[in-house]
């Protein structure tokens, strides 16, 4: 009887340990995810990197539809409704296999934090509150990010101001910031967010820093978001901007509208102001086909310079093979105003692309 009892306890103990191990796995998770996007593109009046040109270009480009990237995200249940969360994400140029950033391993995200019913607090490198408005309301749904005026200008990914504003790690854009603390709270249909990025400059804590706040609403087929942020460069010059947007489902069609404005001190006596208007939507043409249309208007005002800007129209036709794989064709046209593109380049530009994007 003793022998039999001992023999039963061994498998029972093994099953108990296995159950505990499974419970531990159920309380934490790590997910590998990513997007692979590559396409063939022809541009007239545009370089392969989408800048103004006097010539035409042909290229295989990465991220025409959706930016190619891979990343890790995870969470651990700490009990009492509290979770630890993290996100590491790196951009990749699929046409060459090179990292999107020459200086950062995880250029798109590198943060860790806590999440509960009151919201989440994360620390590290992450998107600004202006960028969050674009991801929620942009007419293209953040497609063609390197060519999208909402991403590049309204949300400062490519602000062309010639200085690093906020701890972005770059003088060309401030879509994401280093050394930041971010709070996001969701309460029923409403959300709020606040973010501060430390400049970490000796002798002056405000130089190279950034602060921002935002709010949003989402219910049924309606989404609205508004954010304000301010940045400083290493010399203490300021950049202040706001961005708002809204989208609505009308039947099976989606309409979206955005407007953003920012003003930057480029010297002690000079300023640059950019205003960006976006309008567009998504029209299903069948169970597997979507037509996405967007038009953007950019106006730039600079001290002691002629006002300039451009109008840009973009169209995507997408065919969904599955939830994770789709093919796309893209067409765009840009009309520059008052030499925005550079005096030696064409006054208008156009492009056509075709490619495949797969998410995992």
Language model features with spans:
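Outer membrane beta-barrel
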Residues: 28-42, 58-199, 207-209, 216-223
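Detector for outer-membrane/organellar transmembrane beta-barrel domains
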Residues: 206-314
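Outer-membrane beta-barrel architecture
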Residues: 71-73, 111-113, 182-184, 214-216, ...
């Amino acid at each position: 009887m003793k022998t039999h009892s001992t023999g039963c306890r061994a498998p029972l103990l093994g099953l108990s340990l296995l159950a505990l191990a499974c419970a531990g796995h159920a309380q934490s998770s790590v997910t590998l995810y990513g997007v692979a996007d590559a396409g063939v593109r022809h541009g007239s009046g545009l370089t392969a990197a989408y800048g103004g040109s006097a010539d035409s270009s042909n290229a295989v480009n990465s991220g025409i539809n959706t930016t190619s990237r891979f990343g890790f995200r995870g969470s651990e249940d700490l009990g009492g409704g509290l979770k630890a969360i993290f996100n590491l994400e790196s951009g990749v140029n699929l046409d060459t296999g090179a990292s999107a950033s020459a200086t950062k391993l995880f250029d798109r995200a590198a943060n860790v934090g806590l999440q509960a019913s009151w919201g989440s607090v994360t620390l590290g490198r992450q998107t600004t509150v202006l960028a969050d408005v674009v991801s929620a309301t942009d007419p293209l749904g953040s497609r063609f990010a390197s060519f999208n005026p909402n991403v590049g200008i309204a949300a400062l990914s490519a602000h062309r101001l010639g200085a690093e504003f906020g701890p972005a790690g770059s003088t060309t854009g401030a879509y994401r910031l280093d050394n930041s603390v971010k709070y996001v709270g969701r309460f029923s249909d409403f959300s709020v967010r606040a973010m501060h990025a430390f400049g970490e400059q000796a002798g002056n804590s405000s130089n190279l820093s950034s602060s921002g706040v935002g709010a949003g609403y989402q219910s049924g087929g309606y989404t609205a978001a508004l954010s304000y942020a301010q940045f400083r460069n290493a010399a203490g010059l300021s950049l202040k901007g706001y961005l708002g947007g809204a989208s609505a489902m009308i039947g099976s069609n989606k309409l979206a509208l955005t407007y953003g404005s920012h003003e930057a001190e480029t010297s002690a006596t000079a300023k640059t102001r950019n205003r960006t208007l976006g309008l567009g939507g998504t029209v299903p043409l069948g169970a597997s086909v979507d037509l996405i249309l967007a038009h953007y208007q950019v106006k730039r005002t600079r001290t002691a310079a002629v006002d300039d800007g451009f109008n840009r129209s973009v169209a995507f036709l997408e065919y969904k093979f599955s939830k994770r794989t789709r093919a796309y064709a893209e067409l765009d046209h840009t009309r520059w105003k008052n030499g925005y593109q550079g005096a030696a380049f064409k006054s208008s530009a156009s492009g056509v692309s075709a490619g495949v994007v797969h998410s995992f």
